[in-house]
Amino acid sequence: MTPFNRSIFVLFRLTVCAFLLTLLFHPSAGCSTIHAGQRADSSRSSPPEPRNNLQPSLTISPDSDEFSLNPELLERILEGPHGYFRFINTLFAEAVCARFQDDLGGIPKVNLYNDAHLENYAITERGRGLTDFDDATIGPMVLDLVRFGVSMHLTCRANGWEDKAEGMVDSFLSSYGAALKNPGLTIPPPEVVAQIRARFTTERERALAAKQKLMEPLGEPLENFEASFKQYTDQMKVQHPDLPSYFFDIKKAGRLKIGIGSALDEKYLLRVEGATKVDEDDVILEIKEVKDLRGISCILLRKAIPMRPIVMQARLAYEPYRYTGSIVIARSKGYEREKTFWVHEWYDNYHELSIRTSFQTPKDLHDIAADVGVQLGLGHPRNISDSESSGLRSTMVSTVERLQEQIEQAIADLTRQTVAAWHEFRREAISGKALDRQQVKHFLYDQGANPPSLPSKKGGKS
């Protein structure tokens, strides 16, 4: 059995088991698949499990190897609470599990994006919406609703629109409910999307060159990389038998070191031959390590199974990726544990929103919030239970109505806690434990930072 087929079989078996468990047990935030004394296979430590309904802290320390070895990551997190919020996704998700612990048995389990925030909204020449499905899984719908709500509050705060935040959340939840009630709902792209697309290049050489600049040295001979990549090319021969045999031949490969929440994950960019031997029709692929999610206790699919993000993106995306596949690298290749990766095409034009520069007016943010609400409202129940899809959507609508006050309170509380945790993180970093003298000067003077807050260009807080 090939690694790809084995992954499909494992995902099917886990999905069936998860369904049976939901019938037999009410999941609680206190449960975990990790036994006492064991650690999850993750580059970051798992958050403490909540006890007696106590929410885990959102505070992390800047005095760690994660930041000393990644000074650029530290700088991005210090820029404002939203960057910090992006980095602590596992801690944040577990905090939401804890807050809704007593209600989890009655909250539908859905296709969960599991890292919903505004800077994961991207525009391409083919589509728009939340992308980057590394954390996607099956779990309670409130995780996406609360996380995106906090992202909107932090974005309003950064732009000086705090008085608009609650209205943004209302728009998001209203659009979410509308999509649940009407699974055929479509809305036009927000005006921001059209403005960004107007700046896209149609010159392939320029687009390919820009992607190639992101490739950093592999650190190993390309031949070693190609040996593992063959797993993926074998899958593509089955999925796309009409493509020429050389379509996925590697022309250039490199490490990819961008992002905040995924900054510590292993990622690669590849330039492959494409449909002809002409450079202009080359294709860019991204290879990303599949995240281990065992630090989040109330979701159902926690292990790093490569088919998890592949299936979830097909259900959640407005426009699913092309050329999706997987690679499994065994311990014998020098890793401490088996590593799994998923692969997909990168578009020529790919623009992620920025909370500081993408929204010129509150209406811009309002429109994106509504668009994400529709995307999640359509994607959350998709293919979960086709024979009972109408009943599932109705249950989801009633759940949001029943828990709306609790959801809004969780958004408000976790926004405050995230900001407070970021201030503590920043104070500790500036005290000298994580920053050298030059970096301290940069954050205190060059950016105009004035503890405890960073003023934004629009007069709001960071």
Regions found by a protein language model. Name each.
Residues 24-40:
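Signal peptide processing junction and immediate N-terminal pro/mature segment
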Residues 1-10:
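N-terminal secretory signal peptides that target proteins for export/translocation
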Residues 37-66, 79, 83-113, 118-195, ...:
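Conserved ATP-binding subdomain of kinase catalytic cores across diverse folds
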